[in-house]
From Swiss-Prot:
Residues 36-90 are annotated as: Hypervariable stalk region. Intact N-terminus is essential for virion morphogenesis. Possesses two apical sorting signals, one in the ectodomain, which is likely to be a glycan, and the other in the transmembrane domain. The transmembrane domain also plays a role in lipid raft association. InterPro entries: Glyco_hydro_34, Sialidase_Influenza_A/B, Sialidase_sf. Disulfide bonds join 92-417, 124-129, 184-231, 233-238, 279-292, 281-290, 318-335, 421-446. It comes from Influenza A virus (strain A/Fort Monmouth/1/1947 H1N1). Inhibited by the neuraminidase inhibitors zanamivir (Relenza) and oseltamivir (Tamiflu). These drugs interfere with the release of progeny virus from infected cells and are effective against all influenza strains. Resistance to neuraminidase inhibitors is quite rare. The gene is NA. Its EC number is 3.2.1.18. Changing residue 369 to Q: In strain: A/Fort Monmouth/1/1947-MA. Keywords: Calcium, Disulfide bond, Glycoprotein, Glycosidase, Host cell membrane, Host membrane, Hydrolase, Membrane, Metal-binding, Signal-anchor, Transmembrane, Transmembrane helix, Virion. This is Neuraminidase. Catalyzes the removal of terminal sialic acid residues from viral and cellular glycoconjugates. Cleaves off the terminal sialic acids on the glycosylated HA during virus budding to facilitate virus release. Additionally helps virus spread through the circulation by further removing sialic acids from the cell surface. These cleavages prevent self-aggregation and ensure the efficient spread of the progeny virus from cell to cell. Otherwise, infection would be limited to one round of replication. N-glycosylated. The active site is at 151 (proton donor/acceptor), 402 (nucleophile).
Amino acid sequence: MNPNQKIITIGSICMVVGIISLILQIGNIVSIWISHSIQTGNQNHTGTCDQSIITYKNSTWVNQTYVNISNTNVVAGKDTTSVILAGNSSLCPIRGWAIYSKDNGVRIGSKGDVFVIREPFISCSHLECKTFFLTQGALLNDKHSNGTVKDRSPYRALMSCPVGEAPSPYNSRFESVAWSASACHDGMGWLTIGISGPDDGAVAVLKYNGIITETIKSWRKEILRTQESECVCVNGSCFTIMTDGPSGGPASYKIFKIEKGKVTKSIELDAPNSHYEECSCYPDTSKVMCVCRDNWHGSNRPWVSFDQNLDYQMGYICSGVFGDNPRPKDGKGSCGPVNVDGADGVKGFSYRYGNGGWIGRTKSNSSRKGFEMIWDPNGWTDPDSNFLVKQDIVAMTDWSGYSGSFVQHPELTGLDCMRPCFWVELIRGRPKENTIWTSGSSISFCGVNSDTVDWSWPDDAELPLNIDK
């Protein structure tokens, strides 16, 4: 083959290779375009699954439930139409209490990122229930958890997370800077109340759907404080009780009526011989019933009931089955404060049914240990100590703490009555245990008209944690 033939042959081969390469590149471009078109077409579509609509979108949703599967957000669509929670139903008839949630926060926090918290509570809208809690601006098993036995600090905040989940930075939502708080839903939006500031000049910041709408300044300049449980909404108005003044003597107590985050009316209770703190409130046939803590001189619990005009009645639970802690042994009750072991106290609750009531209380008379529910059919009005039902919730040997009421509205449950529920705080750490921190987990129960069981659902985390050693 002469040189010219070699050149022609090599050139022909190069041309063929170039043409093949060009064809491959064109095919690759077409393939990429087709693949992109398919992905784009599938990015936003709906499909029917058991008559429920499942929507897949690469976008952020509000008021939806997310289920995380293989890092893909599957959004289960549901009716988010606003309604006004009427609050005009009576309490559901019940035979006992069924376990609703348990978050095991301290146990999980020994290894995972879980907030140091206290004062957890639950509140429900017509769509969902949420756990609210006061953080200490710190995580369990971390150096910043040191000294969190302190109640009031600028690091505390009201946050929320799904019921039954351990409160962590990954599932929690900031609500308000607060060392005392309340929250509730009127069917259209969340009202949050967060109190923060110095003891002699604290301010309550009211938010409606996350926007500041009102502030309330301490009027007695002596630790303004509120419920540490849910406020109550009836027919578009929400109600809360605040206390300002001594914790061991007569103080000032005010009821506030709030609409869309704005205070529309308030009154001060005329209660010179009573003490109302950390009230647990619930709606019942368009009225509001609150059962509170007497930290001054009562080992039974004070109550106040009021209508939407803030006309009120008040008294003490008469039963000789005493609900506070510390308290004397059960005996003869009183429709006024029972002074024996009446100083100090713990947040608690009861539900009234006619002349009777369900009384929630610690099992121990002198320490925050154990928890039980007692049905006293005449306890609201009769001072004897007879009761018919006792249901064990936490054993005497295990720590408990604050407790409070919350309800599930008919708009959520589909029932024709208001379902009564309660939560119990399970405090761990200081001052009773050898740790540098104070925190807790929580459990909750709802009333049912069917079979229930006695058992113990304790926190049961093994202490001390690594940070304490």
